[in-house]
Amino acid sequence: MRVKICGITNLRDALHAVECGADALGFVFYNESPRYITPKDAKRIIDQLPPFVERVGLFVNEGVETIDTVCRYSDISLAQIHFDVDEESLDAISLKTLPVVRARTAEDVHRFPDRYRLVDAYCEAYGGSGKRLNLEWFDGVDCSRIILAGGLTPDNVNEVKQYGFYGVDVSSGVESVKGKKDLQKVERFLRNAKSL
């Protein structure tokens, strides 16, 4: 199972996550988030990452031009679109996109069936809330294109393996305080998520 560590704000956390086996790192370009990072600071971190690490930019209520500009400048490889958007808008962005489904009901997990998508629990804030989805919503669902987020921790990530998710995304579940990762939690989360 692939793993994204989201809410990266410093080089130490980024390099530790990669060293522990993270497939992707998330950078939050939403200035109301406690995990916000400027494009300039994200670029400084990204420039020091090894190859083959997916660099994901998280955007909330931004236009196509802003998303493209920030991604080009920071060397982001995937734009995570954390607001309501249609297929046409996703296609207008110049790089690969990952729509986020903020699920309120079981029906919501079926949105964007032909795309890879991130499914998170609905909450007023955008990500990093620690709110968990009802896993029963995924019974009988093809989860091979779904990245699960919301309320995941080193202690519960094993519970989601039976569903066959493409990947998992964690932020608050591996933090010591908002915006700073707990290195031991990151290591445990990755070990548990990647174990058979």
Swiss-Prot record:
InterPro entries: Aldolase_TIM (IPR013785), PRAI_dom (IPR001240), RibuloseP-bd_barrel (IPR011060), TrpF_fam (IPR044643). Disulfide bonds: none annotated. It catalyses: N-(5-phospho-beta-D-ribosyl)anthranilate = 1-(2-carboxyphenylamino)-1-deoxy-D-ribulose 5-phosphate. Keywords: Amino-acid biosynthesis, Aromatic amino acid biosynthesis, Isomerase, Tryptophan biosynthesis. GO terms for biological process: L-tryptophan biosynthetic process. It is an enzyme of class 5 (isomerase). GO terms for molecular function: phosphoribosylanthranilate isomerase activity. CDD domains: PRAI. Pathway: Amino-acid biosynthesis; L-tryptophan biosynthesis; L-tryptophan from chorismate: step 3/5. Belongs to the TrpF family. This is N-(5'-phosphoribosyl)anthranilate isomerase. It comes from Sulfurovum sp. (strain NBC37-1).
